[in-house]
């Protein structure tokens, strides 16, 4: 009902408060990082990184605008996956921007700075990460 005020009293419950802070942070990222909103209809600004793990319900993609790249990784299942990976054509570093499994959002992962470096395996640069159940992680990707 748009005629009445939001149910702000729900924020006294940890799960609601966590979700409120998660959406607030996500909106801030969206408004301040052009790779989230520029060229959204340009097919060259989007690249699937992992779609072959659909039986696991794991998906990863890159959004690139000019020299800026964001990597999104999602686990839509109730399983914890360790060392989920994707191959990249050059060495990169991922800097975590947000993780829906952070404790402050109601999850189980402690908030700490996370940087993931790709590893060369004689064929490609491999990026590995853990994906807890029902989790989305967003990273800024830098070339190294």
What are these regions (language model features)?
Residues 1-144:
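Carbohydrate-interacting/catalytic domains
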């Amino acid at each position: 009902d748009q005629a009445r005020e939001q149910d702000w009293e729900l924020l006294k419950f940890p799960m609601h408060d966590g979700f409120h802070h998660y959406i607030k942070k996500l909106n801030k990222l969206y408004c301040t990082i052009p790779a989230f909103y520029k060229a959204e209809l340009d097919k060259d600004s989007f690249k699937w990184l992992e779609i072959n793990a659909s039986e696991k319900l794991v998906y990863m993609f890159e959004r690139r605008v000019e020299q800026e790249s964001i990597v999104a990784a999602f686990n839509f299942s109730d399983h914890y996956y360790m060392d989920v990976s994707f191959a990249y054509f050059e060495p990169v570093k991922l800097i975590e921007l947000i993780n829906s499994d952070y404790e402050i959002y109601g999850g189980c992962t402690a908030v700490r700075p996370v940087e993931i470096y790709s590893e060369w395996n004689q064929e490609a640069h491999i990026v590995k990460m853990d994906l807890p159940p029902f989790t989305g992680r967003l990273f800024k990707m830098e070339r190294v």
